[in-house]
Amino acid sequence: MPPPTAQLLGWELIDVDVEQGTIRIAFHPDERMLNPRGTVQGGIVAAMLDDTMVPALYALTGGQYLASTIDLNVSFIRPVQPGRVIAEGRVVNRGRSVVFMEAELLSEDGKLLARATSSGIPIELAK
């Protein structure tokens, strides 16, 4: 289930709630992902959040659907430091032609680092 970017981002599945369409993932950003200030570059943070929301749809549909992201909005709340961070993603609403998702990125001690909302086109996977 992990997307191809999983290895780069240090993707680690924590848990999935299929009925609720939620997922928790740990990421492990390292020094390759830092900006000149020594914090994780914003595009990497956005990728982590995107790589949390789409697997939430996959979980909700029992592995039948992924989403092609058509809109991604990220709010950067606090700088993300290298090391383990936790992302929580969920499907907010699933329609036939568009799915709406959201995710939060948290420090290990539970501080909100970033939040994202996304819409995507559901794509049925080959059976």
Tell where the protein language model's regions lie, with residue ranges.
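Terminal targeting signals and extreme-terminal segments of soluble enzymes
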Residues: M1-K127
